[in-house]
Each structure stands twice: as structure tokens, then as C-alpha cells.
Amino acid sequence: MSRVVVLDSSALLCVLNGEDGAERVAQLMPSAVIGAANLAEVVTKLRERGLSVEEVEEVLGGLPFDVRPLTSAQAHAIGHLRPATRAFGLSLGDRACLALAAELGLPALTADQAWAGLDIGVQVELIRG
């Protein structure tokens, strides 16, 4: 069985866009976890590119990952992460991924190079770099 990671939206978009690092992410996807907030970011990006509702559901429907809901505890953690991540320019979605990774004790997988400098008690793995 593959090791388990928490996917940032950038990791999933990397696969969908066929970017560098997509193979690495694709190998981890069958055992990966993604938060509902990060999945919403991916849906938003696909819709902004002009995909229809049906096309988005077709693209995402067959992907093998475990979607986790956003909990109240995660919402608080997202807010509490703001001071430590503000200088890195992390969005609410970025912090949602990190909060889920912290809650589950799993590494967060991202394409966002800005995460490399984080020191918040969550293991960050960069897809490229």
C-alpha cells in the first residue's frame, strides 16, 4: 500500500494539468486524502477554465482519493495558522490543507514552493524541488 499524504489543491491540479511532478502525485493518489475546501478550490479552477458542471464531475469523479469534510476543529486551526503563515502568503485553502495534515499526522503534498520555509509542525513535501 502507498503511503498516505494530504493533497493540496496544487497537487491535484498538477495531475489534472499534466505538469512536472504529476506522476509522483498520481502514484500517491490511491491512498491520498484531500480536504473538501481544497477540492472546492480545484472545482473552482476547472469551472474558471470553462468546464461545465458535467465535465468537472467527469474529470474528478473517477479519481481515487478520500475527501474529508471541513470540521469545526480544523476551522479553528486554519485561523490559528494565519499569524505563522501570513509572511509566506498562504491562502485559507493552503491553511485548510495544513490543518487537515496536522489533525491526521500526515505530510502535506504541494506544488507551492512557498511552503518550503514553513515551521509549523507539519511535514511538507514539495512535488518539485
Name every feature range the model reports, one short phrase each:
Residues M1-I34, L46-E58:
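Short, well-structured N-terminal submotif of metal-dependent ribonuclease cores
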Residues V5, S31-I34, L63-V67, P107:
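Short loop->beta-strand "edge-of-pocket" segments that line small-molecule binding or catalytic clefts
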Residues R68-L109:
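Active-site neighborhoods of divalent-metal-dependent phosphate/nucleic-acid chemistry enzymes
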Residues A11-L12, N38, Q74, A96-C97, ...:
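Alpha-helix capping/helix-boundary segments
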Residues S2-V4, L98, A102-G129:
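Acidic, PIN/NYN-like endoribonuclease modules and their adjacent C-terminal/linker elements
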Residues V43, L60, G79-R82:
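Amphipathic alpha-helical segments within well-ordered protein domains
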Residues L7-D8, I34-A36, L90-L92, D112-Q113, ...:
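Histidine- and aromatic-rich ligand-binding microenvironments
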Residues A22, L39, V53, A75-I78:
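A general structural signal for well-ordered alpha-helical segments in protein cores
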